[in-house]
Amino acid sequence: MDTLTKPISAPRRRTTADTVYPILLLVSVTHLLNDMMQSVIPAVYPLLKAKFGFSFAQIGLITLVFQMTSSILQPFVGRYADRHPRPYSLAAGMCFTLAGLFALALAPGFAPILLAVALIGWGSSIFHPESSRVAQLASGGRKGLAQSIFQVGGNAGSAFGPLLAALVVIPYGQTSIMWF
């Protein structure tokens, strides 16, 4: 049989042995860091309310801006990421979040705080679709397990963030937010 008449073999089916656990663990750790940084926002509400004399409506608006930018934009970013995968968007999302934390740490009033939490939200909306895609690619067909490992990182970060904020931000003030 020459090469022209050889049957084409079916593509190799992925097996659970193809699960790339180091990648899953790394993306879970980045999810932990990302969500830890985000969870600082509600943890510092009492500090912001006391320092700037914000009303509960203003605190609610801070939450609204963060949630709108982190949640509403995410499906649009996810759709774009499906069509044009950009692995560097993981780092880009984290950079937006970091810039938002620095801005929040130095914000002198309400409007700059809104901009800071918007940056943090944009970081989240950029980070999550691509990192979830990476977890799925590393799953080796074990998508439920991969998503669970990925999600544990985010949930742990959401749990640790307020605790660390209580230990760091409350004693050292608003500028210590940039330590996250």
Segments predicted by a language model, with ranges:
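Extracellular/periplasmic helix-loop-helix junction of adjacent transmembrane segments
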Residues: V44-S71
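Cytoplasmic helix-loop-helix junction between adjacent transmembrane helices
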Residues: A116-G153
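Residue-level signature of mid-helix packing/kink "hotspots" within the transmembrane helices
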Residues: S39, Q67-P75, S158-A159
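Short hydrophobic/alpha-helical segments at membrane-entry points of transmembrane helices
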Residues: V27, A111-V117
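Extracytoplasmic
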Residues: L26-P46, F54, V77
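Conserved MFS/SLC helix-loop-helix module at the cytosolic interface between two early adjacent transmembrane helices
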Residues: I72-F110
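Helix-loop-helix hairpin linking two adjacent transmembrane segments in secondary transporters
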Residues: G153-F180
